[in-house]
């Protein structure tokens, strides 16, 4: 299942999990939509509230000083704008983890499954990861998600440090049964390094993975 299917199959009362601003607000983060002033000047992460396309598209770090109105009265973008449909949030530091939680609604059980850590060079855009590595590490299921009304086979959560930043009602498909996945981006060679295989998997600016 992919994100568009997950949205279609989502219980109406659970659709808030697709809106990252609502997720952030429920978790008590410092955040707000376009048009709401930031509490103090500083670096914030700016993202679309809803991004069904995934891959961190549209996300960036921005220095915001006060108001975040998207347009001036002359309909001209300012240097301090946040686009309509976007939101700003405080920046978190730490490891980027993606965790699948397998659920059995009939038995009301929950089990942690695939857990991977993402690595991204500091100067890369937020969508451009260097690799994903399977890890064996316990990550507690977020308390806020126990209130979900629908029945889902898998709930995927992404964390920065211990902060939940995204929720998906489908599994992580990138690494499959492998232990490591290196994204191969547009215009890069598809000749795999030693002990890796190339797997075509096209998405935003990506043509596949080297996996092992």
Give residue ranges: language-model regions.
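Active-site nucleotide/adenylate-binding loops and adjacent lid/helix of ATP-dependent enzymes
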Residues: 2-144, 186
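ATP-dependent carboxylate activation and anion-phosphoryl transfer catalytic cores
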Residues: 55, 92, 107-109, 120-212
């Amino acid at each position: 299942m992919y994100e568009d299917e997950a949205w279609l199959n989502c219980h109406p009362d659970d659709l808030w999990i697709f809106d990252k601003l609502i997720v952030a607000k429920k978790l008590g983060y410092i955040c707000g939509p376009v048009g709401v002033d930031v509490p103090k000047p500083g670096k914030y992460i700016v993202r679309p509230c809803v991004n069904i396309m995934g891959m961190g598209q549209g996300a960036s770090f921005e220095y915001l000083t006060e108001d975040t109105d998207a347009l001036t009265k002359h309909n001209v973008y300012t240097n301090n704008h946040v686009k309509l449909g976007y939101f700003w949030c405080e920046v978190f530091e730490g490891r980027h983890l993606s965790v699948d939680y397998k659920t059995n609604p009939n038995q009301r059980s929950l089990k942690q499954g695939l857990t991977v850590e993402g690595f991204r060079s500091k100067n890369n855009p937020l969508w451009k990861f260097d690799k994903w590595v399977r890890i064996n590490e316990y990550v507690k299921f977020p308390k806020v998600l126990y209130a979900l009304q629908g029945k889902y086979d898998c709930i995927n959560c992404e964390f920065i440090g211990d902060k939940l930043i995204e929720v998906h009602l489908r599994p992580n498909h990138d690494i499959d049964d492998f232990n490591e996945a290196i994204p191969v981006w547009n215009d890069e060679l598809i000749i795999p390094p030693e002990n890796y295989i190339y797997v075509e998997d096209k998405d935003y600016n990506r043509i596949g993975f080297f996996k092992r």
